[in-house]
A protein has these predicted regions:
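Conserved short strand/loop->alpha-helix "switch" segment adjacent to the catalytic nucleotide/phosphoryl-transfer site
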Residues: 7-25, 79-81, 99-129, 136-139, ...
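Conserved phosphoacceptor histidine of two-component systems
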Residues: 19-33, 37, 41
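Conserved DHp (HisKA) dimerization/phosphotransfer helix of two-component histidine kinases, i.e.
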Residues: 34-38, 48-104
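Short beta-strand element(s) in the Bergerat
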Residues: 104, 155-159, 200
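Short beta-strand/loop element within the Bergerat-fold HATPase_c
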Residues: 143-155
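Conserved DxG motif in ATP/Mg2+-binding regions
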Residues: 159-165
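Short C-terminal beta-strand
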Residues: 160, 199-210
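ATP phosphate-binding glycine-rich loop and adjacent ATP-lid/helix-beta elements
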Residues: 169-198
């Protein structure tokens, strides 16, 4: 086969980074579905009750993680979506997937805010990453509380994620922080962290709409 067959056609525009993430996410979701189906088939094909129960439990756990993954896919809606509802679904799926099993209480207090679907998706990605960092680093993988608050003031959306852990600023996660800052920049906003003896607070501030590029 000619190497030329593998060249990208100049008429095909390259995918933007977040579009690429979306495409990969859909493929991962399909892989979850196939893995769950395989576990169900294996469970149905065994006569050992303990093995069947273990396979069923593994399938249920994988299904919960798949649900959390799907919650972070870009909203199907083209127009504005209710940010509170969208983030609430993300938080609920993360609780079912892992937080509840570690004794983490995830509390959500969000105003009804209608935001363009692409912006809502990015906020959801940021919130999910901040929750993961709070659970893993702030709470150290153990029990505790994480609070998500979303409010609108003077044309700005303010989103805070706080925990009651003991993470110091010096130990702040690096890779997750860079991801959050990059997404915040795409939204035309910023994110700041505060570390106190009572826990960590990360606050995202973004405009309701992104000003057109000059």
């Amino acid at each position: 086969m000619s190497l030329q067959a593998f060249e990208t056609s100049p008429s095909v525009a390259p995918l933007q980074p977040l579009h690429l993430i979306e495409e990969i996410s859909h493929r991962v979701a399909n892989e979850y579905t196939e893995a769950i189906a395989t576990l169900h088939l294996a469970a149905a094909g065994t006569g050992d009750a303990r093995v069947r129960a273990a396979l069923g439990g593994a399938a249920a756990r994988l299904r919960a993680h798949a649900e959390a993954h799907r919650a972070l896919l870009a909203p199907a809606a083209v127009g504005p979506v209710d940010l509170a509802d969208y983030v609430g679904q993300v938080c609920a799926s993360m609780t079912r997937a892992s937080l509840a099993d570690h004794g983490v209480r995830l509390l959500v207090d969000a105003d009804e805010i209608w935001l363009e679907s692409g912006r809502s998706w990015r906020v959801g990605l940021i919130v999910a990453e901040l929750i993961r960092n709070a659970a893993r680093h702030g709470l150290g993988g153990g029990p505790g509380a994480i609070r998500v608050s979303i409010a609108k003031t003077c044309g700005q959306v303010s989103c805070g994620v706080s925990d009651n852990g003991r993470l110091s600023g010096a130990a702040a996660p690096g890779r997750g922080r860079r991801l959050v800052e990059a997404l915040a920049a795409e939204l035309g906003g910023s994110v700041d962290w505060w570390f106190t003896p009572a826990g960590c607070l990360a606050r995202l501030e973004i405009p309701m709409t992104l000003a057109p590029a000059r």
